[in-house]
């Protein structure tokens, strides 16, 4: 009986804990401290409320100015450009399940990071964390640094 209860307990814990995956791929020559300004390429397919604003505020935590551009032609004057995608799901309320950021400097990818709630978060309570919290984590690993400004 103890073994059955232990198995049920472990199974319940696995369902509730869920898994979050954050991946990063930085070029060896990438120096986040040299970044002062980033142009963000607006992705109209992302339907998460105020996503561009959340991303801009997240870079500001690191002392990096940014601006979102709706027109691809406007990005030609930018040295550093962020392209992104993000998905959301529903479970009583919408929440972000996936995001990927690609940072290009002079047309070359210098950093890439992604966030994924495995199984769309299942019963894990961390799926309810705000989009801002998830984006902040993603920008932190994208830059390979901790925020300097709160």
Language-model segments: what does each one mean?
Residues 47-51, 93, 123:
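Secondary-structure boundary/capping motif
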Residues 68-89, 94, 100:
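A short, hydrophobic beta-strand-centered structural micro-motif
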Residues 52, 56, 98, 132-139:
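Extracytoplasmic/secreted envelope proteins and their assembly/folding machinery
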């Amino acid at each position: 009986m103890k073994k059955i209860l232990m198995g049920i307990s472990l199974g319940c814990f696995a369902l509730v804990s869920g898994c979050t995956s954050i991946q990063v791929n930085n070029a060896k020559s990438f120096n986040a401290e040299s970044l002062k300004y980033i142009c963000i390429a607006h992705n109209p397919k992302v339907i998460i409320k105020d996503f561009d604003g959340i991303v801009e505020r997240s870079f500001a935590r690191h002392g990096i100015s940014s601006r979102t551009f709706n027109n691809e032609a406007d990005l030609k004057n930018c040295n550093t450009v962020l392209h992104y995608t993000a998905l959301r799901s529903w479970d009583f309320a919408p929440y972000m399940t996936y995001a990927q950021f690609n940072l290009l400097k002079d047309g070359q990818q210098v950093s890439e990071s992604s966030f994924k709630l495995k199984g769309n978060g299942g019963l894990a309570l961390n799926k309810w964390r705000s989009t801002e919290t998830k984006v902040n984590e993603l920008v932190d690993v994208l830059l390979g640094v901790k925020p300097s400004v709160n």
